[in-house]
Amino acid sequence: MDNTDRRRRRKQHKIALHDSEEVSSIEWEFINMTEQEEDLIFRMYRLVGDRWDLIAGRVPGRQPEEIERYWIMRNSEGFADKRRQLHSSSHKHTKPHRPRFSIYPS
């Protein structure tokens, strides 16, 4: 094996590693925010739009990228199914809702 083959393989390996480091938005984990954080983000968004750095400056401990990702996941139609799955799985451990009275005669 000559040097050009080794260099070519090394370069291909580096390209493959770089490609695998990228994370698709489909693989994002949901970001949990407190009600206060959600309220602040919504109010700030109405004031300044998608200036995530300004919004993050008002939400302690949150990065602009994190807030933008939260906003996309919360408001995008593409994540509607994931939101429903997350919502339904969080309510599986609660008691099922039963009406106080039956609409059917006993």
From Swiss-Prot:
Mitochondrion keyword on record: no
Query: According to the lineage, what is the superkingdom?
Result: Eukaryota
Q: What is its main location?
A: nucleus
- GO terms for biological process, alphabetical: fruit development; regulation of DNA-templated transcription; regulation of trichome patterning; trichome branching
Expression is induced as follows: Negative autoregulation. Repressed by CPC.
Tissue distribution is: Expressed in roots, leaves, siliques and inflorescences.
Q: What ranges does the record list as Basic residues composition bias?
A: 84-100
Establish whether keyword Nucleus is in the entry.
yes
Gene Ontology molecular function: DNA-binding transcription factor activity; transcription cis-regulatory region binding
List the residue ranges of the region (Disordered): 83-106
Going by the UniProt record, its keywords in alphabetical order are:
Developmental protein, DNA-binding, Nucleus, Transcription, Transcription regulation
Role of this protein: Transcription factor. Involved in epidermal cell fate specification. Negative regulator of trichome development, including endoreplication, by lateral inhibition involving intercellular interactions. Promotes the formation of hair developing cells (trichoblasts) in H position in root epidermis, probably by inhibiting non-hair cell (atrichoblasts) formation.
List the PANTHER family hit by this protein, alphabetically.
TRANSCRIPTION FACTOR MYB51-LIKE ISOFORM X1 (PTHR47998), TRANSCRIPTION FACTOR TRY (PTHR47998:SF88)
Complex and partners: Interacts with GL3 and thus prevents GL1 GL3 interaction. Also interacts with BHLH2.
Its protein name is Transcription factor TRY
Species per Swiss-Prot/TrEMBL record: Arabidopsis thaliana
